[in-house]
Amino acid sequence: MGERKGTNKYYPPDFDPAKHGSLNGYRNSHPLRERARKLSQGILIIRFEMPYNIWCDGCKNHIGMGVRYNAEKKKVGNYYTTPIYRFRMKCHLCVNYIEMQTDPASCDYVIVSGAQRKEERWDMQDNEQILTTEHEQKQRLETDSMFRLEHGVQDKAKLQRAAPSLSELQEVQSAWKDDFAINSLLRSKFREEKKQIKEEEERDQALLTKASLDLKLVPEVEEDKKIAALLKYRSLESYEQKQKKKRSEICNRSWFSPGVDSGQQAPGNTMRKLGIRTKTPSVPGISPVSLGVVRRTSKEENKAEDKSVESPDGSRSRKAEGMCRKEETGCKEEITERTQSECKLNTELTLTTSTLAAQGQTPTIHTVSCLVPNYSDSSCESEG
């Protein structure tokens, strides 16, 4: 488009280059258009940017540095050969006009009217900035040799005071001198960290897959390891440690039971400790009489006995009745004794079985049936 604008301009038929010179002269216009409407007065409209913070005198509002205005630019004088320009602009918050102009002597802008500057300046010497050489001082350095010598001594003293800071800055800069080596070292470090992160992610993903979980794992820390170790529900000792502990207990264990004299121990205990199995004595045979079982008599025998003990007048004799009571009491005493002996025998069998199991031998189990006699229809029961 720019190329077409330069080559495809329309020249009317009455255009005379000797008379008009250019199309702008033919149309009586300026290339800057509206910006040059006051050019006859020496005023050019430009875009001015506020150089520092100010307060407007009309509305007392704050105008920040960098705010732009359409300002009228006008030349008002010279500083030596440097022109001094004045800028006039309207506040965007009120109808007040602000005027500012350049100050080439101090390389700054000065407010002429309409505003006040927000004072944020400081002494360049106190702030350790580079000072601009004054014109008078420059002329004196060129003409006065003694002043130049004193100024050189001051510069050397200042250099000695700044030497440690300068050397420190040089060391910092030298660290970044070989940028290729530093970049290679940094990239290798990044690759190692990336590899570690990838391994941790794979390990975490395998753990989540194994546990069928769908959550984000946080990085593991040493404190979490200690807490997790305390929450384990299994022994912390390994299989080898358990076996070693068990062997040491067996080696340190006494061959003789505590509280029993070695001379009073039975030979069977020594045989068990040596690992020699002995034949377990069998339990003596149990007969129905030892268990207190009473054989029932038939009805015919009961009738015969009743007839033999009845008196001629048809009543049971006192003698027969006393014999029955005596027989019944004897049966009950015999049953009580048999029951106590059976309980004692069962207790001995239980103790023997537990002892053999503790010593690693297979106990011989003997089943003892407990028969309960029924005396509801015995011959000793009194009738009607």
From Swiss-Prot:
Gene Ontology CC, one term: U2-type spliceosomal complex
Stretches the record annotates as Disordered: 1-28, 275-331
Keywords: Coiled coil, Nucleus
Domain of life, per lineage: Eukaryota
Compositionally biased tracts (Basic and acidic residues): 297-331
InterPro entries named in the record: Saf4/Yju2 (IPR007590)
Listed Pfam families: Saf4_Yju2
GO terms classed as biological process: mRNA splicing, via spliceosome; RNA splicing
Cellular compartment(s): Nucleus
Coiled coil is among the record's keywords: yes
Coiled-coil parts of chain: 183-212
Family: Belongs to the CWC16 family.
Protein's job: May be involved in mRNA splicing.
Record protein name field: Probable splicing factor YJU2B
Organism: Xenopus laevis
Gene that this sequence comes from: yju2b
